[in-house]
Swiss-Prot record:
Subcellular location as annotated: Endoplasmic reticulum membrane
Pathway: Phospholipid metabolism; phosphatidylserine biosynthesis
Pfam family, any one: PSS
Activity: how regulated: Inhibited by exogenous phosphatidylserine.
Record topology, Cytoplasmic segments: 2-35, 94-102, 182-186, 238-286, 331-355, 402-471
Lumenal compartment residues: 57-72, 124-160, 208-216, 308-309, 377-380
InterPro entries, sorted: PSS
EC number: 2.7.8.29
Annotated region (Disordered), positions in chain: 426-471
Positions carrying Phosphoserine: S417, S440, S452
GO molecular function: L-serine-phosphatidylcholine phosphatidyltransferase activity; L-serine-phosphatidylethanolamine phosphatidyltransferase activity
GO CC terms in record: endoplasmic reticulum membrane; membrane
Protein's recorded name: Phosphatidylserine synthase 1
Length: 471
């Protein structure tokens, strides 16, 4: 009996692995102050589900067939999200509430299943489904069929430049601000930005709207819109890194204003992680991981344009911008989980949200290829090969630049994990070194707490206490 029990005992490495994976896949809420919002309500949800199903099944008018199908689909989505709240993992985030991120994961699973379903339809069936969702799509036209691109590029006037600052330029700016908040690296953001412009050049023979004048591509896109967004996002990152996070209970706040501020701050991060994608001793494994990250990022961006070109809907249509918002929501936990997998030796598998995101990206590409065979038959294979080589080359340049910066200026900036954080799995220093690093100096990990405290004492600008910022 004793030997049987002993065989079930987990080793220390297995325990550490499970703890580290759980912190990125099933993050726990610490210091719960209002138990009601975090206590399981399974019986309540079960009762609500049964009662609501009985009510809608026996009281609604089912004389309109199309209305029955539409309401049935919405009900399936709604109750699938309820199951998501009960059964799916939290992911790496807990703010404003883990249930929100469980529903985000549930929506990503639904979208994944929907893409699988599309693969078994023909093009006419997919178009019929789109016309059922929005009859106006019958009259939609491709932007490339009614607009001209890269015309009279030698004519550069102030009026023409100002005319390019439209809603899409605004979207570029804020989109890159959000991307910078997720990636948190100047070098990687600039590399992805420049690589995307190269991607447009290499795929211009398939998508005519990728054609741009040089001043539009270099000055307006890369420098102003993308660069401004990256700068704003990184400024916010640095601000959040400098804060000391201490969250008090609602019960300890006695003023109405303080309670309101604490409630609003519930929608802000519980802590902030300083990330470091590259290290001076980065191995090939980490370089390859960042290269794969950039390829999937570019693929996801390409899917946006191929989907609306093949299935013919405008960029302003809800099918386009709703997908962009949805992809943005699932990208946040995906990047966090992928970074942990790439840099943490104790994390030996990717998180579930990261896995689903990768499958979605490749499934969208497969859907585009299946239903756009006429378009992809014009593909110049040499351009695609050059594109892959350019991404690899820019990844190497990014690595070289970030390593050079770390060697010359890294000593001025001690890395640290999240300020009073509960997620040590993605901090840079570990007792056994970092994944993808051939030799991580153990002396930093032994003094990590002192380095972190000294940095906070020297640079901290504000402190969040009881939900109220104090200078």
């Amino acid at each position: 009996m004793a030997s049987c029990v002993g065989s079930r005992t987990l080793s220390k490495d297995d325990v550490n692995y499970r703890m580290h994976f759980r912190m990125i896949n099933e993050q726990q809420v610490e210091d719960i102050t209002i138990d009601f919002f975090y206590r399981p309500h399974t019986i309540t949800l079960l009762s609500f589900t049964i009662v609501s199903l009985m009510y809608f099944a026996f009281t609604r008018d089912d004389s309109v067939p199309e209305d029955n199908i539409w309401r049935g689909i919405l009900s399936v989505i709604f109750f699938f999200l309820i199951i998501s709240v009960l059964a799916f993992p939290n992911g790496p985030f807990t703010r404003p509430h883990p249930a929100l991120w469980r529903m985000v994961f549930g929506l990503s699973v639904l979208y994944f299943l929907f893409l699988v379903f599309l693969l078994f339809l023909n093009f006419e069936q997919v178009k019929s489904l789109m016309y059922w969702l929005d009859p106006n799509l019958r009259y939609a036209t491709r932007e490339a069929d009614i607009m001209e691109y890269a015309v009279n590029c030698h004519v550069i006037t102030w009026e023409r430049i100002v005319s390019h600052f439209d809603i899409f330029a605004f979207g570029h700016f804020w989109g890159w601000a959000m991307k910078a908040l997720l990636i948190r690296s100047y070098g990687l953001c600039w590399t992805i930005s420049i690589t995307w412009e190269l991607t447009e050049l290499f795929f211009m023979h398939l998508l005519p709207n990728f054609a741009e004048c040089w001043w539009d591509q270099v000055i307006l896109d890369i420098l102003l819109c993308n660069g401004g967004g990256i700068w704003l996002g990184m400024v916010v990152c640095r601000f959040l890194e400098m804060r000391t996070y201490h969250w008090a209970s609602f019960k300890d706040i006695h003023t109405t204003t303080g309670k309101i501020k604490r409630a609003v701050l519930q929608f802000t991060p519980a802590s902030w992680t300083y990330v470091r994608w590259f290290d001076p001793k980065s191995s090939f494994q980490r370089v390859a991981g960042v290269y794969l990250f950039m390829i999937i990022w570019q693929l996801t961006e390409l899917n946006t344009f191929f989907l609306k070109h093949i299935f013919v809907f405008q960029a302003s249509h809800p099918l386009s911008w709703c997908r962009i918002l949805f992809i943005g929501c699932i990208t946040a936990p995906t990047v966090r989980q992928y970074y942990a997998y790439l840099t943490d030796t104790q994390c030996k598998r990717v998180g579930t949200q990261c896995w689903v995101f990768g499958v979605i990206g490749f499934l969208e590409a497969i859907v585009c290829i299946k239903f756009g065979q006429d378009l992809f038959s014009k593909t110049q294979i040499l351009y695609v090969v050059f594109w892959l080589l350019c991404v690899a080359f820019t990844t190497f340049l990014c690595l070289y630049g970030m390593v050079w910066y770390a060697e010359h200026y890294g000593h001025r900036e001690k890395t640290y994990s999240e300020c009073e954080d509960g997620t040590p799995e993605i901090s840079w220093h570990h007792g056994k070194g970092s994944k993808g690093s051939e030799d991580s100096p153990p002396k930093h990990s032994s003094n990590n707490e002192s380095h972190s405290s000294r940095r906070r004492n020297r640079h901290s600008k504000s402190k969040v206490t009881n939900g109220v910022g104090k200078k």
